[in-house]
A protein has these predicted regions:
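Register position in tetratricopeptide repeats
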Residues: 45-46, 79-82, 116-117, 145, ...
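Hydrophobic/aromatic packing residues within the alpha-helices of TPR/SEL1-like helical repeat arrays
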Residues: 56, 93, 125-127, 156
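Terminal, low-structured helical/coil segments at or just beyond the last alpha-helical repeat
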Residues: 129-183
Length: 183
């Protein structure tokens, strides 16, 4: 009887213990990359810049060659710009444009970086003879930033008319509306 009671109590203890199958943790680099990017953004809000830079670098390493990587590199570049390292930011913005060249914000950030570095005129000379529509975007932005607003607006407007089906065209048109409203 004592054995029966001991076995019965053991069975009750096992069934009532709430035992469940152990949770399997799977590593998903893409999700982890977004997590680290979001942590970096939170560090930026808290003005903890070194930690933000490290989080963005981790996000880039976890997801090295995707469209999301362009976002991470842009965030890293904006952080470098904010703390006063435009040369490091330039590399990040150029990499972001190479990975995903259809985000107008990346071009604006790179143009601002060129202005900070003081190489706007040399970049305009380099881009003047290019036939690439993406180089025309950069040229128009640099012209506007250098003070030749009319020339830059014409360059970007011509691009919008020549390439109406580009995904970036609506963002360029919106930017042109904002620039012409200030004049």
């Amino acid at each position: 009887m004592k054995k029966f009671l001991a076995i019965f109590l053991l069975l009750i203890a096992v069934t009532c213990s709430g035992y469940r199958k152990p949770y399997k943790y799977t590593i998903d680099a893409g999700k982890d990359a977004f997590y680290h990017n979001n942590v970096g953004i939170n560090y930026l809000k808290d003005r903890i810049y070194y930690a933000a830079i490290q989080e963005f670098k981790i996000a880039i390493q976890l997801s090295p060659n995707t469209q999301a990587t362009a976002i991470f590199k842009n965030n890293l570049g904006e952080t470098y710009t904010f703390i006063g390292y435009p040369e490091m930011a330039r590399v990040c913005f150029e990499d972001a444009i190479k990975l995903y060249g259809l985000n107008f914000k990346y071009y604006q950030n790179l143009a601002e970086c060129f202005r900070t570095l003081g190489i706007t005129n040399t970049k305009m000379k380099e881009l003047a003879n290019s036939k690439s529509p993406y180089d025309k975007i950069m040229l128009g932005l640099l012209q506007i930033q250098s003070g030749a607003i009319r020339k830059g607006v014409i360059t970007l407007d011509d691009l919008c008319n020549q390439e109406p089906n580009l995904l970036i065209t609506p963002a360029i048109r919106q930017y042109l509306k904002e620039v012409t409203a200030k004049i």
